[in-house]
Amino acid sequence: MSRLAKKPINIPQGVTVEVNDGTVKVRGPKGELTQDFLPYVKIEIEDGKVWIRPNEAQVRRKSDWRKVKMFQGTYWSLIRNMVIGVTEGYKKELEIVGIGYRAQLQGNTLVMNLGYAHPVVYEIPSDVKVEVPAPNRIVVSGIDKQRVGQVAAEIRAFRPPNVYTGKGIRYVGEVVRQKEGKKA
């Protein structure tokens, strides 16, 4: 368990957190997120704070404490990410590097020319927003941290950065270590 899980999660103004039967629902100005949890921990709301405490009923022997503490830290992070998501949201930026490589939005699909003989078409999920501010830049945003990261990773997987030339799709700020080519 991380030491962070011993601290409560503050609930900001305009955010409501509901806990019932292993399900946590977080509502905020940007939307609503729901997550199911296993009964290894007790999730309680006291004085505008969310506490994640070990469920002692799940501990049958001493070795079970390890699993309970593990879930306590994990669930603390998941609930905190939900609260941040419904208040601020999450964003991942990708850049396309390469001559003739570009992206454009056509309705609910992202069409990318990535050096293949055909354009790559990606259907955008409904819970994530994708913008193309420039032909070589893609911005993925949403309230669910996991979904935003998953969609960004799927887009990047169409043409990951080449280790010799550096061409491909990369995260903004990602450093691609380039290998040296063959010596003649």
From Swiss-Prot:
Show the GO cellular component annotation of the record.
Answer: cytosolic large ribosomal subunit
SUPFAM superfamilies, per the entry: Ribosomal protein L6
Q: InterPro entries, alphabetically? A: Ribosomal_uL6-like, Ribosomal_uL6-like_a/b-dom_sf, Ribosomal_uL6_a/b-dom, Ribosomal_uL6_bac-type
Pfam families tied to this protein: Ribosomal_L6 (PF00347)
Function, as annotated: This protein binds to the 23S rRNA, and is important in its secondary structure. It is located near the subunit interface in the base of the L7/L12 stalk, and near the tRNA binding site of the peptidyltransferase center.
- Do you know which NCBIfam families this protein is assigned to? L6_bact
Indicate what this protein is called per its UniProt record: Large ribosomal subunit protein uL6
Lineage, opening ranks: Bacteria, Thermotogati, Thermotogota, Thermotogae, Thermotogales
